[in-house]
Structure formats: C-alpha cells, structure tokens
C-alpha cells in the first residue's frame, strides 16, 4: 500500500507537473498575493535574491522548502535574476477560486529570459535584448539566426567555424541557443561569448522546418527576394530561434515581419579586440562612459539611441548607405535639426510599445503614450507638408513612413482615458462614453455615496439614533453601525452582521439589496473593462505593420538629428569617399579625448595629420611614452569608423578609400578566465590580424613584442612589420619602442618614419603631442619615470645605467639584418603517400571505402 505521508498534496502535484515542463527554469508559482518558489528553485532564488528561505508543512513525506516575493514587486526581482543570466517561468492563477474544486487552475503565461525581454522595466533603453541561435553544419560551417523580440526583424548569416567568435562579438547576444549535439571544440568557441547559453534538443534545429517557419512568419511564398533559399544551416538555426521565442512569449510573433541576410563581405570587420581597444560602447574598465557612443548619443528617444549604436557597430563596406546619411545630415545641419529635435523630445518608444501590443502585453499608459506620440507626429506631418521639396532621398523615405496610420489615434482616444490606471486589472482604463453598458455600471457605483447618505438620514429619523452610521468595508461589505448605548432603539428588521467591543453592525433588507446591486456592478464593470480592452487590442493589430515602419523611421530620424547636432557642436567635417586606396586626414582629433579636455578645462587637443596611400601604406611611429602615440592611432581608427558609418568626423578634412576591416593590437591584459598570459594574448591577436587583414584593412599595432625578452620581442616585431608590409599590404600604424625598427623604412619603400615630438628643458620633458616626420631621437622613459614620482635616487641610478648600456651597445652591436627575408626552404618532394592523401575526400567515403583507403595508406607508409 502507498503510504499517505509519501504522497504529494494536490497543490504540490500541480506545481510539480508544471515544473516538469520547465526543468531548467525558475518557476514563480502564484499563490494569492505572492509568487512562491519551491525546493531547489527556492534555495537558488533565496541565494540569488537574498530572500528568506522557509520550510512549511510536508508534501511527499518531506518538508516543503519555499521562498516568495510579493506580486507587486515582481519586476524588480525579475530584473535582478535576468541580470544574473537566469530564466523565469511566470505561473498565474487562471481559474476561478470560487468555483474551483481542489487547487485553482494555474498555467505558465510567459517565460522571461535574457534574450526575449519585452517588459519596459527589464530592458535597457539604449540596448537591445538579442536572442541568437547557432547551428553547426557538416562542412566546417555554421548557420546563425538572431532577433530582438521588440525590434521585429530576423537576421540570418552563414560563416566558417573559425569566424564564429567574430560573429558572436558582432551580434553580442543576450542569450545563446545551440544544438546539444555540437562537437566539444565548437562548444568551446561558443563559450567565448559571456552570456546566458543553453543546449537545445537536436530536433529543434531542422533546416526544412526552419524554412517553413520563415515563410509562415514573413507571410511569403518564397525566400528568393532575400536570396536566402540555400542557407540550410541558417534555416536550422531559425527553426530553433522562432520556436524558442514563441514558447517564451506564449504566442506567435505577428510583429516580426522583417528579414535581413547578413553576408561576411558586406560589413566592415570590427573584431572584439577592436571594439574593446577603441572603447566604442564601453571603456576598458567596463563603464558606459566616456566612450564614442556616449559622446555621439544625444538622441531624444531610446529607439534612436539603439539605432545609432547599431549603425556604429555595423558599418557597411558599400558606401551608398554612408553617403545617404551624410547627405541627410548636411540637410539637417542647415536648420531643421533643432526644430525636429525639439519635436522628438517626449516621443514614446514606439518600437517597444508596438512589440508589446503585438504580444498583447501592452499596458494602458503605454497606449496613452503612443497616442500622444502619434498626435505629435500628425502635427509635424501637417507642418512639413510643404517642405518636402529638395529633401535628400533618405529623409524623403523617412518622412513618408512617419505618417501615423489613419484611424489609429482616434481609436486610442475613444477607448482609453487620458490618465488611466497602471494595469487593466485595476479598472479605470476605458474612456467615458466608449461603452453604454460600462457607463451604466459606473453610474451605479458613482451614485453609491449619495444613496448611503440618504439611507443614513432616513434611518436616523426612523430609529431616533442620532449617531447611526451607514458604511462599507471590503471584508464585511455594507453595514449600519450602532453604538452600545443605543442598542435598545434598534428596530426588529435589523439583522446583526458583526459585533465589536463598543458597537454592533447590522444590515437591513433594503441595504442588502443595494449591496448586491453595487458589488455586482463593480465586478461587472471590471469584467466589462477587461473585455473592451481586449477588443481594443484586437482592433489595433491591423496597425502593427504601419506602426513598425513608423518606429524605424522615427529611430533613424532621431539618430540622424543626433549626428547633425554633434557635427555642429563639436565642429566636425564631412568626409569624402574616393575609389583609390587612401586614408588622408587633415587636422584629425580624438573625439572622446577632445571632449574630455573641454569638460575638464585640460586645454586644447593637438590635432594631427595622417596620410596613408598606395605609395606609403605603413607608418612606423616612435616617441616617448605618454607622448600620444596610442591616442594618435586610435583617433585615425575612430575617424575611419565614423566616416564609414556616415557621420561627420573630427577633422578639418578627410578623404577615405575602400575599407574592409579595422584591426587593433593595442595594450595587453591577462585573460585569466581563459588561461591566456599577456604575451600569449598579444601573439594570438597578432596572428588573427596577420591571417585576416587585406590591402583594404586598417591595422593598428601598438608596442608589439613587449611581452617577452628584448631580442625575442624585437625579432617578432620586425617579422610582423615585414609581413604586414610585404604580404598583407594593409594600411598600418605601427607604434614601437624598439628604435632598431626605425631602420625599417630604409629597406621597405612603402613605410615611413614618424614620431611624437617632445622637448627637454634640463632634466625635464615637455610632450608636444604632435606627429612629425622621421624617427624619434630617444624614448624619454627615464623622464617619464621622474614625472610619475619615482624616487630621485632610482632616476639617478637609471641615468647612469642607461649611459653604460648605450656605450656597450655601440661597441658590441652585431650587424644583423632584422628585416631580411628568411632563406627559401627546398621544395618538398611529394611521395606516393602524399599523393594518395591528396586524393582522399573523407566527407564522401563510405565506411567500406574508408577502410580500404586506410589499408592502402598503411601499405604506402611501409614502402616509404
């Protein structure tokens, strides 16, 4: 027989059944005014949220371990869990408590995960929450599919396995899905991205199913217009992506109606090291400011900020988009940007409101904010009706899409109060005059106070009890209260409802009839409001495509206005794109350093020129530490990036040829988490650059070789410089502390020497931060040490030691050509075994053919 003590209670049976469907997710189980978590979930939540862990009663013969959070505080706790990379299933009571036999019916209504956030309280205004799925293909390739649920566009891509880390850095997902059957080596590549990641069942990554899902999602018959029909690995990733996104939202995603296929050759490569070293969106300390993005972002809306960040991190090699933005900015600079920016202020985040509307999660006050924004845009449209002549093409398209969809504003105004309650469950949302039945029910509630006062007056007159009161509370409903001293005057038709210490509370047939009517009206009014709200959401679904277009246009206009404002305020110039290979910058400045100097009163930024061309592709940069070599290199890269985005640049003039990548090897820091030493990281990044850079790439090499011994470092630096000059032929800024490398340009005509100037005054040094032709005469390292506060005895000792070392080097220096090409190795003789290996394609062999080939190779090996 089953021991009753070992069986679970009905409520725990319900919980365990729900938990079984979400084994890897924290389940928040609604019980009254709290969300409870049980057993292992409770222990985990208590640890992560710092909430109390308790044990109450028993179920299945064991104490029930539990913890809970108030329902009205849920969003704050969710935000903390999401930040920690956790996912949470929200389980609500959906049944009627009054009619339920046993536990009230409950079900999971949504799953909140780091990559599928839609709640305003959980999202960063300036950043997307991105869900990425990756599928490993059969031939050393993989497919990627990603989306932001609030943005409404699916992205597909194919890449080689060894390019995966670059793609992960580019997409920067909040959550990553991958096939549980991937190889260990592939899984290790995925773990370079520090985000929430989960292995999903292999059947979810189905290429044919993914293609069908894309067709259904986009409501098209073919993917040919996107040239996306043959991307089988990406289709497999899309299958898992869409299935997971729909599962977390508990419904389809009707607002996701865009598709973009991103191809490797379309974007300018910005590896993770480049994004980090140039401090595009985060400082080297991991802070949001001061960065290039924080300097540029004067957008009036969150969606404008997100669009601007996307532009900054995804510049295209094709110049058409950048040129269109430059033309739009030029027009906005001439006057309209100030007026437009004033009108953009106060606009709501239409993009995220539209997504929440499509998912039926939108709140009443968000609908009011949407209506107010549409009102503002309608007024702007009417004012701009006669100003469209002469607009650049990009602005023309934007203003066309900014038209509010006809009827949407009026519908919102008819249904929703100007100042509604925060949630529909509280009532007070639907406008007066919208629905006659609701108005009638509200009238009953409104007349309640008048009826109670009138009844109180009549009962006082009838009973002679002067202090008699007619009142209401949520526990006991309506009642007539009589004090103890007046109880002898109570009529026979009063029925006792509650006894207090100093009074009795009664109800009469008349008051009971009114109570039934009033309470019924309140419940019916709330139910009616909820029904009307659902009807409104139904009608608004038809406007989602137009609202999505409007949101994209509004975001683009906001971002363009921000770039126009920055160009005027910071005195930036328009770059010029040319076909010949060149980076020609006159009076260039580092935008972030210049802004910081202006803020802190640190003086004026020293502008510098940079000229790289087909004739001179490399600069060997020498000069003192603290002189500004790294700043100069970074500013060149930032100017190239800004121009490629379609922004004005911090320079007097800029001519730019084709660019396909910006690579940086600047500074070094131990990657302890991945067990990489400083020098190993330095060499790894250098190797990646040497393998991937092309003649159209910009390469920044700062102090390469400093992580090892002097001779090793010098030899490696010389070899790397020669490879970049002779083989890669990339535009290269090569800063070094090895003065032997100043001899490099004498033997390599595509390189020139430049140096950062400084002057000495006695034992002191003044940095001029100016780039001048020719090599530096010395490094001034000891002078820098003195500036840093190193004790004078150490400085004096160092000066004597330096003098002795320089004398010794002059006398004994070996005459070694650092830059001579290595002797050519003898051409290897190809053996029969080599030829046999060359003819084998492992991917096409059957098991029997593979075995035969193995025996043949063994035979040839014995003969060799």
Swiss-Prot record:
SUPFAM superfamilies registered for this protein in UniProt: DNA repair protein MutS, domain I, DNA repair protein MutS, domain II, DNA repair protein MutS, domain III, P-loop containing nucleoside triphosphate hydrolases
GO biological process: mismatch repair
Pfam entry (one): MutS_IV
Keywords: ATP-binding, DNA damage, DNA repair, DNA-binding, Nucleotide-binding
Organism: Polaromonas sp. (strain JS666 / ATCC BAA-500)
UniProt-recorded name of the protein: DNA mismatch repair protein MutS
Positions of ATP binding: 623-630
Gene3D superfamilies from the UniProt entry: 1.10.1420.10, 6.10.140.430, DNA repair protein MutS, domain I, MutS, connector domain, P-loop containing nucleotide triphosphate hydrolases
GO molecular function, one term: ATP-dependent DNA damage sensor activity
GO-annotated cellular components: cytosol
